[in-house]
């Protein structure tokens, strides 16, 4: 008996069966990539996709972003029919576009329209990173330009939420032309005395960061957003120097005078309301 008490017992672990795994619907839980906390996805969405534990700002779709900023029942989408093609006959590009259209329900990587923020009218454009990583091709540039022109014609403040991997490589020079196209439209808005508020979210990189996203009368960003043109590794290899750990973060850019403010998502609507009230 004593021998049995002190003998080493084998330990066993129960491995859930495939059937047991399937009982938990996919997407019901979300793990925070910052603090590793596991939470109900619906609770995360209720908090505007901001982690209650560490404050990490999770990715939002364009529709979710609009719902969080624009007053209920006031958003009117514009230019929804504009969508890109495959002008350079890039292999597999059309299939990828169609796949993203089915996945997101969008024709392109930006949603544009008009709405109100606590009663103040705005023209708004929101990029959706779930569609080709919100890269800017001809259609995205066209929709943004039309939104800018609408703000110019109606003398209504323009609000753009940027989130992009940069220019869309499958469209070559046509995608790069959108940098100049959107910037020229913003210059016309500026000459007309219009107000442009730019909010950069994670990530805002490449040709988008080097064009319209950085040309606001006010340039804001969400906390910890990655903002920059070239990648960190490319820059380090070019200048042969090690970059600071927080390089290309919203906080780094704010410290070096390239942003006006870093605004937590839960404070975004209130902050924008105060700003719009100042410019009435």
Swiss-Prot record:
The entry's Zn(2+)-binding residues are: 32, 35, 51, 54
Question: Does the UniProt entry include the keyword Plastid?
Answer: no
The broad enzyme category this protein falls into is: transferase
InterPro entries recorded for this chain? AcCoA_carboxyl_beta, Acetyl_CoA_COase_Trfase_b_su, ClpP/crotonase-like_dom_sf, COA_CT_N, Znf-ACC
Q: Which reactions appear under catalytic activity for this entry?
A: N(6)-carboxybiotinyl-L-lysyl-[protein] + acetyl-CoA = N(6)-biotinyl-L-lysyl-[protein] + malonyl-CoA
Chief subcellular location equals cytoplasm
Q: Which SUPFAM superfamilies match?
A: ClpP/crotonase
Its subcellular locations are: Cytoplasm
Look up keyword Oxidoreductase and say if it applies: no
GO CC term, one of those recorded: acetyl-CoA carboxylase complex
E.C. number: 2.1.3.15
Domain called CoA carboxyltransferase N-terminal: residue spans: 28-280
One record GO biological process? malonyl-CoA biosynthetic process
What cofactors does this protein use? Zn(2+)
Q: How is the cofactor bound?
A: Binds 1 zinc ion per subunit.
Name the job this protein performs.
Component of the acetyl coenzyme A carboxylase (ACC) complex. Biotin carboxylase (BC) catalyzes the carboxylation of biotin on its carrier protein (BCCP) and then the CO(2) group is transferred by the transcarboxylase to acetyl-CoA to form malonyl-CoA.
Question: Which protein family is named in the record?
Answer: Belongs to the AccD/PCCB family.
Q: Which NCBIfam families match?
A: accD
The protein's assembly and partners: Acetyl-CoA carboxylase is a heterohexamer composed of biotin carboxyl carrier protein (AccB), biotin carboxylase (AccC) and two subunits each of ACCase subunit alpha (AccA) and ACCase subunit beta (AccD).
User: What name goes with this protein?
Assistant: Acetyl-coenzyme A carboxylase carboxyl transferase subunit beta
Q: Which organism is it from?
A: Shouchella clausii (strain KSM-K16)
């Amino acid at each position: 008996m004593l021998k049995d008490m002190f003998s080493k017992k084998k330990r066993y672990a129960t491995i859930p069966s495939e059937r047991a795994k399937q009982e938990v619907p996919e997407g019901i839980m979300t793990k925070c990539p910052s603090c590793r906390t596991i939470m109900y996805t619906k609770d995360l969405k209720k908090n505007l996709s901001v982690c209650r534990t560490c404050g990490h700002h999770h990715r939002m779709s364009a529709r979710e972003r609009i719902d969080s900023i624009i007053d209920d029942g006031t958003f009117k989408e514009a230019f929804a029919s504009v969508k890109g093609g495959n002008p350079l006959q890039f292999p597999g590009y059309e299939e990828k576009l169609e796949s993203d259209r089915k996945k997101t329900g969008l024709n392109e990587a930006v949603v544009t329209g008009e709405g109100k923020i606590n009663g103040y009218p705005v023209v708004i454009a929101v990029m959706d990173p779930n569609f080709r990583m919100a890269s800017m091709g001809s259609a995205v540039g066209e929709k943004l330009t039309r939104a800018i022109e609408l703000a110019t014609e109606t003398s209504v403040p323009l609000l753009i939420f940027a989130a992009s991997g940069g220019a869309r490589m499958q469209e070559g020079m046509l995608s790069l032309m959108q940098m100049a196209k959107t910037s020229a439209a913003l210059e016309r808005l500026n000459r007309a005395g219009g107000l442009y508020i730019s909010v950069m979210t994670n990530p805002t990189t490449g040709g988008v960061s080097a064009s319209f996203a950085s040309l606001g009368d006010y340039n804001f960003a969400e906390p910890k957003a990655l903002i920059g043109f070239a990648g960190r590794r490319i820059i380090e290899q070019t200048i042969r120097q090690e970059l600071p750990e927080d390089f290309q973060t919203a906080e780094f850019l704010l410290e070096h005078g390239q942003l006006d403010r870093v605004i937590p998502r839960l404070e975004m609507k209130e902050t924008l309301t105060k700003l719009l009230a100042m410019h009435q």
